[in-house]
Amino acid sequence: MRTELLRFNGAVERDPAIDAWMRAHAGELGAIAQEWFEVMRKCGDEVRELLHDGCPVACLGDAPFGYVNVFTSHVNVGFFHGAALPDPARLLQGAGKFMRHVKLRPGTATNAAALSRLIDMAYLDIKARVENG
């Protein structure tokens, strides 16, 4: 059974609200969030973005594939269809039907190559979902 894709109205090429969000989240945690959101932004020319539920979201057109959010002591890099992503490095956390996230903490080593692959796979996954209806 196929489920309808989640769609967000208002995604734009570069959302000034996200730049303001990044400025408001300065410091170590903000730098981590900005680093990984930049990776999402660079996935392709069709990437759009918006602030949704208080955090930066990366979309393919209006279909979201990833987000970042800053918490008290960590950053989440999240994936809207993360449950469907291959995760050989076992970075993904969460038990929901669709979403998963990777928790990043300052001073703790990050498997950057594996996280970059997850972001790439999330982008390719949403692209296939959009193209195949």
Model segments located where?
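Charge-dense, helix-prone N-terminal extensions
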Residues: M1-G133
